[in-house]
Amino acid sequence: MTLAGRIGIMDAGQLVQVDAPRSLYERPKSSFVADFLGTISFVDAIVASCDKTSITIGGDLNICAASDDDLPVGSAVKLAIRPEKIYLSRTKNGGVNEIEVVVEDLAYLGFATNYRVKTASGQMFKLQQQQRRSLDAPLSWGETGYVHFDPQDVIVLKD
């Protein structure tokens, strides 16, 4: 992604998105482009409310996302969240997009730990936690914690 100011992504011989590398990665227009450019967690969801600045997804996860789109209540969307945008902790912090999870898998890489965590409803999230000094001890297999992410970091896809 450092070789060009604009990149084109093709799917089955069709050009599906042309944009700057940062835009392709941070705000892909489709789940294909999002998945093509690296690890990402997807959540199939139904819009519970939308006010042109945010979308709330109901159900067991109750996720809030920033969005410029005016999506009708009840419409199906796919939410996408990059692993580096998700924070894992042992405790609640009282913010939006705070979901209880259990650690299913982890891989310590030295500079970071890659986690695969699961909600009570079975939704999986992949995240990468940077190593830093913290009062929170790292979570291990089978332990319960909370994922946290900002609404601005949730990508809303209509495909």
What annotation goes with each model-predicted range?
Residues 1-61:
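Internal alpha/beta loop-helix hairpins
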Residues 40-42, 50-159:
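Non-catalytic connector elements of ABC transporters
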